[in-house]
Amino acid sequence: MRLLSPVTGSKLVLLFLFLGAVRSDALKLNLTDSKGTCLYAEWEMNFTITYEALKVNETVTITVPDKVTYNGSSCGDDKNGAKIMIQYGSTLSWAVNFTKEASQYFINNITLSYNTNDTKTFPGAVPKGILTVIIPVGSQLPLGVIFKCSSVLTFNLSPVVQHYWGIHLQAFVQNGTVSKHEQVCKEDKTATTVAPIIHTTVPSPTTTLTPTSIPVPTPTVGNYTISNGNATCLLATMGLQLNITEEKVPFIFNINPAITNFTGSCQPQTAQLRLNNSQIKYLDFIFAVKNEKRFYLKEVNVNMYLANGSAFHVSNNNLSFWDAPLGSSYMCNKEQVVSVSRTFQINTFNLKVQPFNVTKGEYSTAQDCSADEDNFLVPIAVGAALGGVLILVLLAYFIGLKRHHTGYEQF
């Protein structure tokens, strides 16, 4: 499928499918608890899926009807995220996750799974089985406001193009009543009509699954303190973003400190910080002492569940990050990447850590990550300076030699 830009000028936005205009029925979900409504959603969506057949790639558009099941949907609370889950028979399942932070909440990931064993929907498909695409959305919305968007919102993550429109959404509803205050999407503010338009052609095959056009928010910074008896022995402050590429499907997950537990331990030569929440069974950061003078991040272990329910675990005990002298802390305010394995990396933001020799529960003087860059640049600068001096000496020598030779000829 190739997506064309909306019609310019009048900005008309209409939705045309392969054989003409088709309208799907709106999906509606009103979850309640003891106070009343706790999650409200109404929207329409369809998916255009390219799948591998015997000799060529085929394309099918699935328009989701209103008669679906919502098993697994939940309202969430301050510690647990909200979730909308949809099942369309055995052909398709869809889910979106929400997390709450202070006075706002985030639409985290959209997960779509489709079953190519359904020969009616996917005739001639090879291979057969359940395939999953995960889109990290990262949209941020205020609490106490209903989000509305009549225009089409398109997520193009090969081999699936997803379209959403006619959206009315409020997660973490307060006081049991859907809000009358609205937040309208920017697409509606610039469009003169709200019916979505897409022109479709058969797409060229691709294996790229990286959602390069989808912004991911910066993670919230968390503070983690580990004690040994009555004394603080480990301090860590950082925003954490987990980047997973499993079977070419990207998964980006921001750790929310508000719903994350942590434990740890301190030994003379090693220290451990362990994080866990409803999705992460454990995420370990293990520090070690090097040459009795410095500390560094030696090991990272992770065991967690992806949005599609599959387990993911990676360990690496041969790392060398966040190196600093004992008695000091390590700090890096800019984004830094810890590559744990080919399929797993951790992006850190506003990092500060001290796993040894903590005094009075406070950070010691920090070694900044920019010092590492300075240490790298110093030899280059010294070498360049020496090279410049050598060039000047050679120039002076040749100039002197030329003058001496000229004087000899005149004599």
UniProtKB/Swiss-Prot annotation:
Which intervals of the chain are annotated as region Second lumenal domain? 230-376
Listed as disulfide-bonded, the cysteine pairs are: 38-75, 149-185, 233-266, 332-369
Q: Record keywords: Cell membrane included? A: yes
The segment annotated Hinge runs over 189-229
UniProt record, GO biological process: autophagosome maturation; autophagy; cellular response to starvation; chaperone-mediated autophagy; lysosomal lumen acidification; lysosomal protein catabolic process; muscle cell cellular homeostasis; protein stabilization
Task: Give the glycosylated residues.
Answer: 46, 57, 71, 97, 109, 117, 175, 223, 230, 243, 261, 276, 308, 318, 357
Residue ranges in the Lumenal topological domain are 27-376
Query: Per the record, which residues fall in region First lumenal domain?
Result: 27-188
Entry PTM: Extensively N-glycosylated. Contains a minor proportion of O-linked glycans. Contains sialylated glycans.
Provide the transmembrane region boundaries. Answer: 377-400
Tissues where this protein is expressed: Detected in liver, kidney, spleen and macrophages (at protein level).
Q: Which residues lie on this side of the membrane: Cytoplasmic?
A: 401-411
Q: Could you tell me one molecular function GO term of this UniProt entry?
A: enzyme binding
List the signal peptide residues. 1-26
Q: How does it sit in the membrane?
A: Single-pass type I membrane protein
Q: Where in the cell is it found?
A: Lysosome membrane; Endosome membrane; Cell membrane; Cytoplasmic vesicle, Autophagosome membrane
- What Gene Ontology terms describe where this protein resides (cellular component)? autolysosome; autophagosome membrane; chaperone-mediated autophagy translocation complex; endosome; extracellular exosome; extracellular space; late endosome; late endosome membrane
* Keyword tags: Autophagy, Cell membrane, Cytoplasmic vesicle, Disulfide bond, Endosome, Glycoprotein, Lysosome, Membrane, Signal, Transmembrane, Transmembrane helix
Q: Positions of the region Important for binding and subsequent lysosomal degradation of target proteins?
A: 402-405
Query: What is this protein's function?
Result: Lysosomal membrane glycoprotein which plays an important role in lysosome biogenesis, lysosomal pH regulation and autophagy. Acts as an important regulator of lysosomal lumen pH regulation by acting as a direct inhibitor of the proton channel TMEM175, facilitating lysosomal acidification for optimal hydrolase activity. Plays an important role in chaperone-mediated autophagy, a process that mediates lysosomal degradation of proteins in response to various stresses and as part of the normal turnover of proteins with a long biological half-live.
How it assembles, according to the record, is: Monomer. Forms large homooligomers. Interacts (via its cytoplasmic region) with HSPA8; HSPA8 mediates recruitment of proteins with a KFERQ motif to the surface of the lysosome for chaperone-mediated autophagy. Interacts with HSP90 in the lysosome lumen; this enhances LAMP2 stability. Interacts with MLLT11. Interacts with ABCB9. Interacts with FURIN. Interacts with CT55; this interaction may be important for LAMP2 protein stability. Interacts with TMEM175; inhibiting the proton channel activity of TMEM175.
What does the similarity note say? Answer: Belongs to the LAMP family.
Which named protein is this? Lysosome-associated membrane glycoprotein 2
**Naturally occurring in which organism (per UniProt):** Rattus norvegicus (Rat)
Its taxonomic placement starts with: Eukaryota, Metazoa, Chordata, Craniata, Vertebrata
